[in-house]
Structure formats: C-alpha cells, structure tokens
C-alpha cells in the first residue's frame, strides 16, 4: 500500500505520538491514565523510554521509514492535527482527501479521522492497514465511520484501494 501510494505520487505523511524527553508537554491526566494502565509514559523499556521523542521505540518501524520529502508529524496527543502543522502541510498542497492508516484504530486513527472530517477533509480509512490490541474495539471504530451514510468518511480494505489506484493510473 505504501509503495503504491508513493508510485501514484501521493503525499505520504507519517505521524508518531511522543513527548519531550523532560515530559514537560505531558498533561497530568494523560500521565495518570498511562500509569493506571501499567504503561507509564517515560518508563524505561526494551526500546527506550515509552513515548519519548528521540528514543528508538518512538521512531517509525523500519518497513515504514519515510522517504526524502515525506513529512513526519510528531504529535503530543492522539490526534495528528492537534498542536501540529499537519493541516498547514495539507492545505498548502491543495490536498482535500486523506487515506488514513495506522494504530491504534480506536484512539489515534479515530481521533485524527474525526478531526479531519471536522476540518472539511474527505477521508477514506483502510481497514486492514489499521490495527488495535483489541479486535473488538478495532471493529467498533471502523463500524462507526459508516454510520449515518458515512458520517466519518468511508472504509475499504487495501485490496480495493490498490485496485482503484491501478485503475486510476
């Protein structure tokens, strides 16, 4: 899917959630919730400190590394639009349609999708290019997109999208 998007000339934007090394941009409520879940933000782990910018575990996985010119949005929260320049990047290029993929479906993907819709973007979420640790929440988040005639855009799988990209080429 990534190779096809690049080959078709689409702008690929990468996002990743993380905080400053001193955690000065980490709200108390988020810190407390993360501690309750057993995964405190900033805690040391096998990939470095959890959700801390600059740590190995904060980086994109090797298979999804950006190419030259592909923006990387470092977001302090769940939504890729909040406290970032994502909207400016998209608007300055005349982009009005987003193909959304990522993790976690019910949190970051959903937050970004809803914010994009509120900002007037047309959105397509790729069901099998999104993931969650909880299959039931993944399914529920995808189901919510299509309610009321597609209130949050549309959903398709990667095979359908790849087919549409081939036809458009």
Task: Name each model-derived stretch.
Residues 7-8, 19, 25, 30-169:
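Active-site-adjacent betaalpha module
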Residues 15:
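A cross-family glycoside hydrolase active-site/sugar-binding cleft signature
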Residues 1-11:
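A short, N-terminal amphipathic alpha-helix
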């Amino acid at each position: 899917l990534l190779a096809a998007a690049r080959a078709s000339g689409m702008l690929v934007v990468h996002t990743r959630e993380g905080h400053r090394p001193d955690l000065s941009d980490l709200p108390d409520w988020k810190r407390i919730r993360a501690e309750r879940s057993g995964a405190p933000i900033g805690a040391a782990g096998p990939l470095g400190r959890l959700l801390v910018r600059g740590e190995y575990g904060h980086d994109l996985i090797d298979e999804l590394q950006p190419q030259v010119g592909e923006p990387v949005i470092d977001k302090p929260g769940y939504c890729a639009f909040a406290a970032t320049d994502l909207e400016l990047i998209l608007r300055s290029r005349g982009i009005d349609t987003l193909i959304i993929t990522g993790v976690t479906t019910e949190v970051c993907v959903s937050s970004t999708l809803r914010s994009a819709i509120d900002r007037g973007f047309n959105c397509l979420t790729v069901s099998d290019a999104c993931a969650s640790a909880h299959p039931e929440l993944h399914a529920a988040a995808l189901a919510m997109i299509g309610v009321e005639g597609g209130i949050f855009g549309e959903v398709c799988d990667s095979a359908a999208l790849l087919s549409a990209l081939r036809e458009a080429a």
